[in-house]
A protein has these predicted regions:
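Active-site hotspot residues in diverse enzymes, especially metal/ion-binding acidic/histidine motifs
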Residues: 1-350
């Protein structure tokens, strides 16, 4: 038994067209279209076929999902570079994970959300907000090793999401679940230096924009503010200015290792702080490109893995003694995708 809205949600989360799904389950596209628009009860054998085709347990189709449009930090500049179908896949997957998170949190407590909402104004710039937020959260001005842990301590759930081919242009986004829990989703296929930057970029949106009542500010302005916020958060002016002053090309690898940001971002920040001039920054960027480092830089940057989702799932499997089958039924997600959210760093003891 099920409702059509969930069939559409499941189908779009897999990037499958009506025609493709209809062929997989042996019905006409017209019949499937009617099913997706219907509130009528659907026969169990057909739902089982659809579940197999879309890789969802039967319980998924009985869940009640919030059908309102997701309020996220995915602003126009990012949307403009992505195909509509790819965006739909990401949004639907996030909608499904958000529901699972809310369900898990019925039995688990996480740190209280403690990041304040701060309005960015002409008098109160994004870099000043980043500086004050770090002081408020007692995050040191030195390079931040366990940066994900520092954000999760503030009650923000971080999720490294495996996107695949549909999300090569997707960096990350911030959203709230139906019950009001903030989640930052990041593309797990990105290099770690980009993950670190995009994490703090999203914290900037969460601080300055996601709860703002200012409807006049353009999305381009918001992106610029989030970039400036991330720059000050990751490379604080007062601390990094000595390292970036008269920065030479040969310094980039060492500074990347120290500050755990990309070489391109170091060049950008050095120019932003007037530590190097326009011509020097252009020369550095060109040299990176010639060395094949425009898309994939040399030099390893570490990043810690998110732990809140891992612990939430682990508590259900271990402390609350759910079997994987029971958890899959409760969340409406297949076991392999639960394990993906659980993370591969820890062994599953069930």
């Amino acid at each position: 038994m099920s409702y059509g809205l969930n069939i559409k949600l499941a189908r779009e989360s897999r990037g499958i067209t009506q025609k493709e799904l209809a062929k997989l389950v042996g019905i006409t596209q017209v019949s499937l279209s009617r099913l997706e628009k219907s509130d009528s009860i659907i026969a169990l054998p057909l739902i089982e076929e659809i579940g197999i085709a879309l890789h969802y347990p039967v319980s998924f189709f009985d869940k009640s999902f919030d059908d309102k449009e997701l309020h996220t930090s995915l602003f126009y500049r990012k949307r403009a570079t992505m195909k509509v179908r790819d965006l739909d896949v990401i949004n639907r997957r996030i909608q499904i994970i958000n529901k699972a998170v809310d369900t898990l949190l019925d039995a688990v407590e996480i740190p209280e959300f403690s990041i304040p909402a701060i309005e960015c104004t002409e008098e109160y710039h994004a870099d000043e907000i980043a500086y004050r937020l770090k002081r408020y959260l007692q995050i040191p001005s030195s390079p931040i090793l366990n940066i994900v842990n520092a954000i999760e301590k503030c009650g923000v759930i971080v999720c490294f999401l495996k996107i695949g081919n549909s999300g090569d242009k997707f960096d990350g986004l911030t959203t709230f679940t139906s019950k009001g829990y903030p989640i930052i989703y990041l593309n797990d296929d990105m290099p770690n230096d980009r993950k670190r930057f995009n994490l703090i970029h999203e914290v900037g949106h969460l601080t300055m924009h996601m709860r703002s009542e200012n409807l006049k500010k353009s999305e381009e302005e918001k992106e610029e503010e989030a970039n400036l916020f991330a720059a000050e958060f990751l490379l604080p002016r007062a601390t990094c200015i000595t390292d970036l002053s008269n920065m030479r090309l040969r310094d980039l690898s060492e500074l990347k290792s120290k500050w755990m940001v990309s070489k391109a971002f170091l060049i950008h920040r050095a120019k932003e702080l007037c530590c190097i001039n326009e011509n020097t920054s252009k020369y550095y960027y060109i040299t990176l490109g010639r060395n094949g480092e425009k898309k994939q830089e040399s030099g390893y940057v570490p990043i810690d893995r998110p732990t809140i989702l891992n612990k939430m799932i682990g508590l259900h499997l271990n402390n609350l003694a759910y079997s994987m089958e029971e958890l899959s039924d409760m969340l409406g997600i297949c076991s392999d995708e639960i394990l993906e959210l659980y993370g591969t760093k820890m062994k599953l003891s069930v």
